């Protein structure tokens, strides 16, 4: 299982939001320094999120460029990618893969065109949810769509990488909801990356036991609760 550090960008800084709430952020300084530190500690992939684009409050294009120029490892880019043009821009900024969420829920036709344009290796889908209650538009809008029905539809469309985040737990260090993660794993037959609440090596062991392919970790890395250099969770 791959451990993937998450660097969220807001107003040019690396931050973590508590339960996805933009009013409850913890700043962690220069995102380039954070990205380089994670790379030096052994990360093989970085998850970069432009929160301002996701929330419609601005963008961090230049910061993304700086991060891309500083890294020798690949990164995936998420946040506000809601058009073919935005998708192409994300990849042109250096991302090895773009991640879409709102589009995948609200506009399956556009998702299909995106998949056709760049292929499933360069496009992942994010399922952001409070448990299994799906949320979109920077986690600010709940929708009635069934999470498990969406998973089936995306698999049939050709999506091959899913990022599931439990927004209730994101940035809280409260640990995982084992039952929900198990249900998502059972419903999704392809690559699954999970985030939201991961707080300790025990959470990583749990994900590994459930057959999850990757763990998105943010606050626990910043706070030193999990260290990339330590391999104990892999055993």
From Swiss-Prot:
InterPro entries the UniProt entry points to: Aldolase_TIM, His_biosynth, HisA_bact_arch, Isoase_HisA-like, Isoase_HisA-like_bact, RibuloseP-bd_barrel
Disulfide topology: none
TM ranges: none
Keyword terms: Amino-acid biosynthesis, Cytoplasm, Histidine biosynthesis, Isomerase
GO cellular component: cytoplasm
Entry's Gene Ontology molecular function annotations: 1-(5-phosphoribosyl)-5-[(5-phosphoribosylamino)methylideneamino]imidazole-4-carboxamide isomerase activity
Coiled-coil features, chain-numbered ranges: none
Entry EC number(s): 5.3.1.16
Active site: 8, 128
Similarity-based family: Belongs to the HisA/HisF family.
Protein name per the record: 1-(5-phosphoribosyl)-5-[(5-phosphoribosylamino)methylideneamino] imidazole-4-carboxamide isomerase
């Amino acid at each position: 299982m791959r451990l993937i550090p998450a660097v969220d960008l807001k107003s040019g800084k690396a931050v973590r939001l508590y339960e996805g709430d933009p009013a409850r952020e913890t700043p962690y300084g220069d995102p380039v320094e954070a990205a380089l530190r994670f790379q030096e500690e052994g990360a093989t992939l970085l998850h970069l999120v432009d929160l301002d684009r996701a929330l419609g409050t601005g963008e961090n294009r230049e910061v993304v460029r700086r991060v891309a120029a500083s890294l020798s490892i690949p990164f995936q880019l998420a946040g506000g990618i809601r058009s073919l043009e935005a998708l192409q821009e994300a990849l042109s900024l250096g991302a090895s893969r773009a991640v879409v969420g709102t589009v995948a829920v609200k506009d399956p036709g556009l998702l299909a065109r995106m998949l056709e344009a760049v292929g499933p290796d360069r496009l992942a889908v994010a399922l952001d949810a409070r448990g299994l209650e799906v949320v979109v538009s920077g986690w600010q809008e709940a929708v009635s769509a069934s999470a498990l029905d969406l998973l089936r539809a995306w698999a049939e469309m050709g999506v091959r990488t899913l990022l599931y985040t439990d927004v209730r737990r994101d940035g809280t260090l409260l640990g995982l909801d084992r039952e929900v993660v198990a249900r998502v794993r059972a419903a999704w037959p392809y690559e699954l990356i999970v985030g939201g609440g991961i707080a300790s090596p025990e959470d990583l062991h749990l994900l590994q036991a459930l057959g999850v392919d990757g763990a998105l970790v943010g606050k626990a890395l910043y706070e030193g609760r999990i260290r990339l250099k330590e391999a104990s969770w892999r055993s």
